[in-house]
């Protein structure tokens, strides 16, 4: 549970002041601030961070080859780059000696091996228009989270629309490193929301199709961005409180490495806070049951309640996926009490991960 932190006196706060305060809070939480404003410096830092994570020093030739083929491949779009973070985060480097070397883009096993940095006012001059981005979070040197701020009193949707303009005009520019962004955060100080990169990119695809069904809300529209909340589902809206919770390094790294689902339809889903809380509590109960040998007892079980349409299946899928990776778990059973739920669940599981559900393995009890 999170206790609200009182905000400063209600004096006028410019967007620049809000940005400065946000970065200060991130630094207090252990983020390293870097005065990076150009692509050259961004690439140089990326090389240094990957070398640090992988305990490996690239030769100039190796780095050029790895960067151009694995990181900034001109044939890769947002979907391909998302896959590299969510699924194919171990890339193979062909060393000058002819040997192969595994290079991690992100460490998903020991999340605090990842170096977290913050930059602001990054300049992109090679897009359709000259652009300055507000604040970006670098994880092992790659911009994986981007934050767009507006001063208090400005509608939050303006920040959402501005990110859409960036995607259209400049995220692809240069080496396209900003197409690695997985999660976007928008805030006007008073209200703060987050959403995945495919929410934004698919919104643009709809615009390109001529804006048919403009009144229809889809998963690509502003309405599908999410508020953050604590474990009791108390919504956290103010940027100050949001930063202390969502942007705590442990939480942010967990969201990026554990609580995203890259579906078979190539959509990136970022779980909602109550889904994350439910999943964590189930995994915690499983660990407790194992440590204290509570198998088969009431204390070794639990009950999670979600309302209709709130994403129960995604919660169960992610829980089953994470539980199956525990070293002492051999099998995860999923029990449904109606045939229509069985079909519906299999369909959803296969959407979250192709081949995750197999009807031939069903058992009638």
PLM feature spans:
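ATP-dependent helicase/translocase motor core
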Residues: 1-331, 340-356
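Conserved, well-structured core segments
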Residues: 334
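Short beta->alpha hinge that forms the Motif I/post-I loop of the SAM-binding pocket
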Residues: 337
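Conserved small/polar residues in nucleotide/adenosyl-binding loops
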Residues: 363-365
């Amino acid at each position: 549970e999170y206790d609200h932190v009182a905000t400063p006196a209600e004096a006028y706060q410019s967007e620049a002041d809000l940005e400065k305060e946000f970065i200060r809070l991130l630094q207090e939480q252990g983020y390293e601030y870097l005065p990076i404003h150009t692509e050259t410096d961004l690439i140089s830092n990326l090389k240094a961070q990957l070398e640090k994570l992988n305990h490996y020093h690239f030769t100039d030739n190796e780095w050029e080859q790895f960067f151009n083929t694995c990181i900034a491949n001109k044939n890769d779009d947002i979907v391909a780059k998302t896959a590299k973070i969510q699924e194919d985060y171990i890339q193979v480097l062909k060393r000058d000696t002819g040997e192969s070397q595994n290079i991690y883009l992100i460490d998903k096993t020991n999340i605090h091996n990842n170096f977290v940095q913050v930059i602001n006012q990054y300049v992109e001059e090679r897009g359709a228009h000259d652009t300055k981005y507000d604040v970006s979070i670098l994880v092992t040197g790659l911009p994986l989270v981007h934050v767009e701020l507006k001063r208090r009193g400005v509608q939050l949707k303006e920040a959402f629309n501005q990110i859409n303009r960036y995607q259209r005009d400049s995220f692809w520019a240069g080496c396209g490193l900003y197409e690695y962004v997985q999660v976007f955060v928008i805030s006007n100080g008073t209200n703060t929301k987050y959403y995945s990169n495919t929410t934004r990119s698919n919104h643009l695809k709809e615009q390109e199709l001529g804006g048919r069904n403009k009144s229809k809300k889809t998963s690509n529209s502003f309405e599908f961005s999410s508020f953050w909340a604590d474990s009791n589902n108390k919504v956290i809206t103010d940027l100050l409180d949001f930063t202390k919770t969502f942007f705590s390094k442990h939480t942010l790294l967990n969201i990026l490495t554990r609580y995203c689902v890259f579906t078979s339809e190539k959509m990136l889903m970022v779980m909602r806070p109550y889904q994350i809380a439910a999943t964590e509590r189930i995994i915690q109960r499983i660990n407790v049951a194992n440590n204290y040998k509570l198998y088969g007892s009431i204390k070794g079980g639990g009950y999670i309640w979600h309302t209709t349409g709130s994403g129960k299946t995604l919660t169960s899928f992610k829980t089953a996926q994470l539980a199956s990776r525990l070293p002492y778990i051999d099998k995860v059973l999923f029990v449904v009490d109606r045939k229509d739920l069985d079909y519906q669940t299999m369909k959803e599981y296969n959407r979250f991960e192709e081949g995750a559900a197999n009807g031939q393995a069903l058992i009638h009890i």
